[in-house]
Structures are given as C-alpha cells and as structure tokens.
Curated annotation (Swiss-Prot):
The chain crosses the membrane at residues 10-32. It holds the Pfam family p450. This is Cytochrome P450 monooxygenase opdE. It comes from Penicillium oxalicum (strain 114-2 / CGMCC 5302). Pathway: Secondary metabolite biosynthesis.
Amino acid sequence: MLVQYQNLPVQNIPVLLLSCGFLAILFRSLVLRVRYYRKAQAWGCKPVPSRFQWDPFWGLDLVWSQWKALRGHYYIPWLSDLHKGQPKTFQITFQGARVIHTIEPENLKCLTAINWKDFGISPLRRGKKAGHPFADRGVNSVDGEDWVFSRSLIKPFFMREVYANTERLLPHTDHLLRIMPPDGETFNIQPYLQRWFLDVTTQFIFGAPMDALTHPERARVTWAMLDVLRGTRLRLQLYRVMHLIDWSWWLRAIKIIHEFMDERIDRVYADIAEHQKRIQAGEDVGPERLDLLWHMALGCPDHVELRSQLSLLFVPNNDTTSILTANVIWHLARNSKAWGKVRAEVLAHGDAPLTFEALRGMKYLQASINETHRLNPNNVTQVRMCVNDTTLPLGGGTDGRSPILIRKGDIVQVTKTVMQKDPLYWGEDPDVYRPERFEEKTHFWEFVPFGGGPRRCPAHMMVQTESAYLIARLA
C-alpha cells in the first residue's frame, strides 16, 4: 500500500485531498442529521415548513432582495412580503445559515424569557466583526458575564428616581415650545424633536445638555449616528461580503462619533482624578454627580472599553424617544377624535405638575402611545442565535402547533411588525390606528415594544415617560 501511494502521480494528490475533504464533510453532515433527528424525536418536535427559494443552499436570492430593500428604504414592507402566504413559523436559508422566522408570541416568550440562556446576541453582533472599528463590547452586543458587567455600568437606567423625574424635562420642553413656529403654520416637527431629545439625553448621560435647540448645528452628531447605524446594519446583514464594499462614508461617521465621545471621556476621567485628589486631601467634593457617564467611568477605567460601552448605549438610542413621539403626533394629527380625547384627559389634569404618576394615570394617552408602538415599532425584529440545542414551542407539523428543534448555530427572528398586526390578537382592523383596543383588552407577549425577559430594554420606562410628557405638554 505504501508503494502504491509513493507511485501515485503528483497531479492526482489535489483530487485525492478534495475527495477526502468532501467525504469528511458528507460524513459529518450525516452524523449531525442523525443526531438532530434523534433529538427531535425525543423532544417531540416536528419539521418546520420551508419557504420556497430559488437558491436553497446559500439563499442568495433573499440576500439580494433584502440588500435592495435596505438600500431602497423599504425593508419593513419587504419583511411583510416575506411572511405573506407563509405559516406563522417557517424556515429559510440566508447566507448559508438556517433562519427561523416566527410571529408566534409563545416563541418570543421562549426566546427571550423561558429559554433565554439558550440564545445569544454576541455571535451575531460581535462574532461577525461587523461593528469594528465603531465598537465592540456593550450591553446590547454581549452575553454572559460580559453582559452582567455592561448592565452594571448602566444601573442609573433602572433607578426610579431617575426615570420618574419629569422635572429634568421641564426646561428643555419649555425651550422647545418657545422656538416652535406659531399657531397655524405648517412645519416639520421631526428636527425639533431630535434636537429636544439630544438635549434631554446628553444632560442625563453627560451631565450637561448640548444646547442643540439653541444651536441646531450641534445636531450634526445625530446625522453621523444615523450613518453609523445604517452602515452597521448593512454590514451585519451582509457580513460575508462586506469586505467587497466601500465603507468610507461609514468610517467618516465613526470618526465624528469617536471624537465626540473621546472629548467627554477624557474630561470625566480628569474630573474623577481631581475628585479623588480632593477626597485624599480631606476637601469638600460637593454633591454626588448623577450623570450616567460618571457612573460608567467609575466602573470602567479603560478609555477604549468605556467608549465602546458608551457608544453602544448612546448611538442606537440617540433618537428613540423623538421617533416614537413623532409617530404618535403623526397618528394623532390624522385622528381628530383620538387627539380630542388625549387633550381632554390632559386638560382635566389642570395646572398640577405632570409627574410620573400623573402621566401613568392618563390611560388614553398611554393607549395612544402603545398603539403607535404597535403600528410603528422602533424595534422591528428580535433576533437571536441559538448557542445550545433547544426547542421552541410552536411551528412544527402541518398545523404549526408542535414544538420545533432549534439547533446550535440557527438564527431565530421574530418580526414584530407582522406579529403586532395579527388579527388573532388585534381584531379585524389591525391596520387601523385605534388606541381604544388597549383599553378593551390586556395584551401580553403579542405586544412587547421594548422586548421581554432579562434583556428587556433598560430604558423602557424612561422612553415611555419622556414621550408621554412631551405629548401632554403639546396638548
């Protein structure tokens, strides 16, 4: 046998190696298929329906159509079309990966709450390196102990005395109302809301507002944030081919964000050093600082690490409240009856302060905001990668009522824009703006605008309060 290999023509060696490699891949695939079949049988799982694709191996047909949707700014309609005519749970192949699409609330509950440790974010967001050089670790990009650490850095988000403090909104809202065009004039309110939110959030995070309402040119950083988000989203979706694309516009936006962050991080580290020096000297250090950056810097002494943590908090959420509030106004402007009910509820409050408790007690105002969340969710999808073989409760079999096997490496995506218009939960008028539906029925996992489970958005109470406060002031 040794002699035979020694006499093997050199030109045949690559063919032999390729054949061995192919056989090894085939053998591994067969072993995995048997293993998954046995697990599915043991766990009572049934097959998931597949959506037809022209390319069932790499899914390049859907990759191309999604790329066009993202570039053409019609991604949400594209998602709706993807689900059209399909069962509530189905599978596709996308860039070679198995992706489970579902709009079952029970699957969302399992994904983010019951079996949440079987699903991760880090393999999707950090593993692909799509966010580099913008940022690496942050509360919305890591799992496990890294996530526990990142969450500890943003503890002020969870403090009631912070998110329930509406007095911090008063001066910025007074300023906004002063500079808005007079009654009767038609204007675009979105830029005003963006600058208002930029002032509100920079005061909370950095301890001082940017004064973007006074100086509109300072909102330049907002446009850079939008470019960073757009580029990062594209890179995440097209990570296998992202090195073939020119990202110079994205890198320029990152440079603006990094300069913005570096200036404030250098300043806070200098303030901490001075603070500690005064303590050692026995001098008065004044009242405790409550801004978020101060708290984060105390727990994270590394500049690059802090910039990453801060960027992944500030940039994705830079205009969350302003977009939500603009959408609420858009709907109320087209529904005079609903607007009249909001105004009546606010005016009945009289001249009393608009406290957190008062705003929570304005049920129709809250219903109007929730109905906007339902129709125009800021968080369009919830996406996780499976890190341990597990199951989801629904989607298997011809009726979709049996469990399904989710294998390590599978991606699960819940499309909330479709789920939140399911007639089963929202009646026969799911496309109609009707806040009363939130007064008629309590909703559970079919409506989780800020996600659910341990990784629920930590700023959910703050966003809801800020939007309610501004709408009430406008009323």
